[in-house]
Design a protein with these regions (language model features):
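GST-like domain detector, emphasizing the conserved glutathione-binding G-site
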Residues: 1-97
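Conserved serine/cysteine hydrolase catalytic core
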Residues: 166
Length: 171
């Protein structure tokens, strides 16, 4: 992201929407979070591979609901605290009223979902944990006010071996 490689002609030719995240699996290129997750779920099904979603139909639906909400709402927060605040440098600008309202909404929803001391939303890891933690980390990494239990949840998700391996690879 820092090098803006996702705006290079080669990237744009390979990935239809030229968006990040992007997945290159062999000769198959795909962008957009939801499409990537659905592809991975189909290409690497459980039980041979770790499931991306909870086993229960209601928990799975709740996880997908949360993901859809994260992607479709909170636009002011996403604009004012892009993922660059996590991976590159914090923003020195305070949140606007709209950004603060989105942050407050995120914190309210996350606080209602993350139990005290819980590392996961649904008892065991699922992809919605990673997405929620990444969204919360837009605030945490920037030093914006976030309740301690949510900071702990973000740290627990960020400490996952898969996340650490990806961070080292991208670093």
């Amino acid at each position: 992201l820092a090098a803006r490689q996702h705006h290079d002609a080669a990237f744009e030719k390979l990935f239809l929407t030229a968006k990040v995240p992007a997945l290159l699996h062999g000769d198959f290129a795909l962008a957009e979070s939801s499409a990537i997750i659905e592809y991975l779920e189909d290409a690497f099904p459980a039980p041979a591979h770790r499931p991306l979603y909870p086993a229960g139909v209601r928990e799975r639906a709740r996880a997908r609901q949360l993901q859809a909400w994260i992607r479709s709402d909170l636009m002011a927060l996403r604009e004012e605290r892009p993922t660059t605040v996590i991976f590159q440098a914090p923003s020195d600008k305070p949140l606007s009223d709209a950004g603060r309202a989105a942050a407050d909404k995120l914190i309210r929803v996350a606080s209602s979902l993350v139990g005290e001391g819980a590392d996961h939303l649904f008892g065991a890891w699922c992809i919605a944990d990673t997405e929620l933690a990444t969204t919360l980390n837009r605030l945490v990494a920037n030093g914006d006010p976030v309740p301690e239990d949510l900071k702990r949840y973000v740290r627990a998700q960020w400490a996952r071996p898969s996340v650490q391996a990806w961070l080292k690879r991208e670093g």
